[in-house]
Amino acid sequence: MSKENSNNVISIKGAKVHNLKNISLDIPRNKLIVISGLSGSGKSSLAFDTLYAEGQRRYVESLSAYARQFLGRISKPEVENISGIPPAIAIEQRVNTHNPRSTVGTSTEIYDYLKLLYARIGLTYSPISGNKVTKHSVSDVVDFIASYPDGTKQMILAPINLTNGTTPEQKLDSLSSEGFTRIELENQILRIDSKEIRQWLSISGAKLKLVIDRYNVSHDEDFLSRCADSVQTAFAEGKSTCIVAVFEDDKRIETFFSCRFEADGIEFEEPNEHLFSFNNPLGACPRCEGYGKVIGIDENLVVPDKSLSVYDDAVACWKGESMSEYKRLFIQHADRYNFPIHKPYHQLSEEHKLLLWNGNHGFVGLSDFFNYLEEKKYKIQYRVMLSRYMGKTICPECLGKRLRKEATYVKICDKTLPELVDLPISRLHQFFQQLCLTDYESKVSKRIITEIQNRLSYLLNVGLSYLSLNRLSSTLSGGESQRINLATSLGSNLMGSLYILDEPSIGLHPRDTHLLIKVLMDLRDLGNTVIVVEHDEEIIRSADHIIDIGPLAGRLGGEIVFEGNQIELFNAENSLTSKYLNFIEKIDIPSTRRKWTNYIEIIGARENNLKNIDVRFPLNCMVTVTGISGSGKSSLVKGILYPSLLKKMNGYGERPGEHDSITGDIHLLKGVEMVDQNPIGRSSRSNPVTYIKAYDEIRKLFAEQPYAQRNGYKPSHFSFNIEGGRCEECQGEGVIRVEMQFMADVTLICESCNGKRFKDDVLEVKYKGNSIFDVLEMTVNQAIEFFQDKDSKTTSKIITRLKPLQDVGLGYIKLGQSSSTLSGGESQRVKLALFLQKEQAVQPHLFIFDEPTTGLHFHDIKKLLESFNELLRKGHSLIIIEHNLEVIKCSDWIIDMGPDGGENGGNIVFTGTPEELAKYSESITGKFLHSKLFSTKLEK
């Protein structure tokens, strides 16, 4: 390869990480590259475990040994050679922080620029008068003096302040010794050494003013210089206060000037960056220390059901024989203050809620009630009662704003910083576009505002217009977190880097995909190499270069099936990706939709941005909840439906989101299951075969073998989790990890068992010539074939439990494969397989899936839909939150939310079948579904 070419490509030779089969390829630099292929084919092994791992390892190894000990240790990937690799940055689909101080604003650095902006051009307003707080300089006072015509009689005075322990007489003597000769007392000018003053001081408590200068206004330089000196002296003697008395038309007008930052008798703190930082003691609210929440009385525990009125026992702590007396007194006085005792709590105005909580002189409010319990908590019954209603609640001092009150006095265009960070990003972007500033403010803030607007634009372009900067990073979904990191990367303007992204389209509505593609192209155009592991059709078609890995998954994958541009991909015969893009393979639309009569209904859903909506979820069919990102899908399904059903059926669970009630045919369900993409186990000991309970039967089968029975081996001897049959040298791990302080840990195959995890005598037990280790090394497909034995009940049970793994498309994974190596999509399908192995339900379950197509290829989605249909055939019900049009078109019923995200969402746009939705012009989802649904039918 020529030197010129070597600089333009990343060359990989002999990559053998996980299932990669010694692959070699050249990846063009400064291009948008998509790596496609089935789930488990080796995409992440190439992108993250090979390219990113090597790029990061080389960077870390370039640092000193001292610096390396503080960084995560990265092992060298199993590859012969990689050349031409730039510094690598991985943006994965996971929430990287659970820090309660981390917000969207801080992670994107927009908040840092906002702090700087408020420190530079923010204006402080007095909370008492609402007037702007100003600090006068000497030149301000001189300009005021010079604003009068020549000859105007004026006088510069300074108030005389007595320090502790100083008498008026002592102060006058001190001023006299400094060279001052006159003071003003009750509008009379008197000499300091006159006897008259001493008499006045003994009689009157009148305030003294020191006469600094008397003059007639002139506009020559000498006069203005004299005034400046006098004003300087007045500020020094008057403790930062200066008075200019103007005599005009037989009137005396006094104007006060202060070089202190004060107004209405309050001295304010001058705006600075630290004042607006909730991570700094100078800016954080002293009560909650910048968290926005404190441990206190939780409103949600005091009023658990907000659909009830005070009369109907909405207040949980005012129930019971003795405590109901407080409720009776409140109701007795309610009429006097026009409090609506029959109105549901959630409909009460803020004024009425304050009355309930703070009470009045006529009755005790909830706050006083809990203060009383606090005083009596030395008694066990009061202590127990108080603990029932304690939880994390909004800080009463800063009201969740995180900053001390002084920071809220500073405004830009009538907006405080906490008000700005609470706005959705779309409205915040609009605010900065319409910002009206003075010429001076514009010059000072031009660069800061440019940086803010650029970063806000990137967030809008990745489909996050509905988020606010105050949103906690820990509450974001994996897709949202990834797109925020992507926007932050664009804002940093890095060049010459390798960006590796894991399915950035997760959680993104088809409407916003083209915006994401533009962001990826912008990142490329800055001079970066952008590698995206992706299944989205539109993103694949937009790539400069496509690498398709396959042909299938697991041991049947790990090969480069195709490498080239989009046009060349259409002619790739072995590529499943090509077949689906060319419509040679496709996911068929169901010929009929399932009818439903039973349902679960949520009434008055108000959580987050939901607009008090009523929703019916049909049972015994496949229901898909769709809508723009941020339209309220998760709030409705995961925030209200799931916890409400869990609490109703089991009596426990997280607090459901705000709603009136949940009704319908709940009695027809035995349980509710949330099937998410969280790992099924994080330890190296956890594996799919133990999760689906097939390993219990395999161990039992080996314990039944003659050699095992002769030696008294029980099923526990074939477990690598407990002592008995496992190798004690490696404790059943098969490997021994040697910790290296400055380098990556070295993993060595256990010399005692040669990586086979069990003792030699246990490995002597064979079934059909294979040991327990040999069985764990088999794939699901191989194991099903191996255990075909019609005469054995145990092998029948094993096959029954393994078959669902094959049905959900996981036939390629090894039985003993560590769960920590499974992708999110694979973990979700393992969970699905566990339910599929159960026989037809006597009392069916409701299964809830949140974007089950994450990480799935078209071919994987086809198998997933077959599994869904199998669940439905067994009498279960499905509710799916999804953006993928292949799943939406195969649904029986769709609940479309919107019309947009954030504050413009939270409504039900449409409910009905896919065909009806595709014809509904008001739905954004419907417009995209129309082309998918009817173009596919035309092809048929």
Please annotate each region the language model reported.
Residues 1-940:
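Conserved phosphate-binding elements of NTP-dependent enzyme cores
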